Design a protein with these regions (language model features):
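Nuclease catalytic cores that cleave nucleic-acid phosphodiester bonds
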Residues: 57-165
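Domain-level signal for Mg2+-assisted phosphodiester chemistry and nucleotide/NA-binding surfaces
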Residues: 1-92, 132
């Protein structure tokens, strides 16, 4: 696949829930989304930065969403759905996949900030279309399928002091 160069058009797509849960469960810390974006872009031409977030009705959410926008992310917000049996779900996988496929003709690289193996098939498709695919996540919670499917991987655990607050 293509190498990294400054003229590459890049989109950074962040699965905020996926990263948040690992940062909290393993490190009891939060993600530094400014550093995440800077590392994802890596000196290339940023086309889009999208953070996919879940609204869970906690008081600090709105300020978090606003902070993401101030950094430069477009935020896509989904409410938690409560089902008849009382279970709750909130998932952005399909939305992220649709955005990546829609943006792909206008990009050279897609950076997926997630460790979710559900995106491995997307990676294969994007690579087939000539788009470089990179992932950024905590390796200890990243699926092998995703690691095998991407052109490049940044392990946030290796530089936790940079990527965690």
């Amino acid at each position: 696949m293509s190498t990294v160069h400054p003229a590459q058009r890049v989109a950074v797509l962040v699965d905020a829930q996926n990263l948040y849960h690992t940062a909290q469960s393993v490190y009891s810390r939060n993600i530094d989304y400014d550093e995440l974006l800077d590392a994802g872009v890596a000196g290339r031409e940023l086309t889009r930065a999208i953070a996919y977030v879940i609204r869970a009705d906690s008081p600090e959410e709105e300020s978090f969403f606003e902070a993401l926008e101030n950094i430069g992310y477009e935020t896509k917000i989904k409410d938690i759905k409560t089902h008849a049996d009382g279970s709750k779900t909130a998932d952005w996988d399909v939305g992220m996949i649709l955005d990546a496929v829609t943006l792909a003709p206008h990009l050279d690289t897609v950076v997926l900030c997630t460790g979710d193996g559900d995106f491995s098939r997307l990676c294969s498709h994007l690579r087939h279309e000539g788009v470089r695919v990179e992932a950024m996540a905590f390796e200890e919670s990243t699926s092998e399928e995703l690691l095998d499917a991407v052109d490049g991987f940044t392990d946030l655990s290796e530089r936790a002091e940079r990527f965690l607050l």
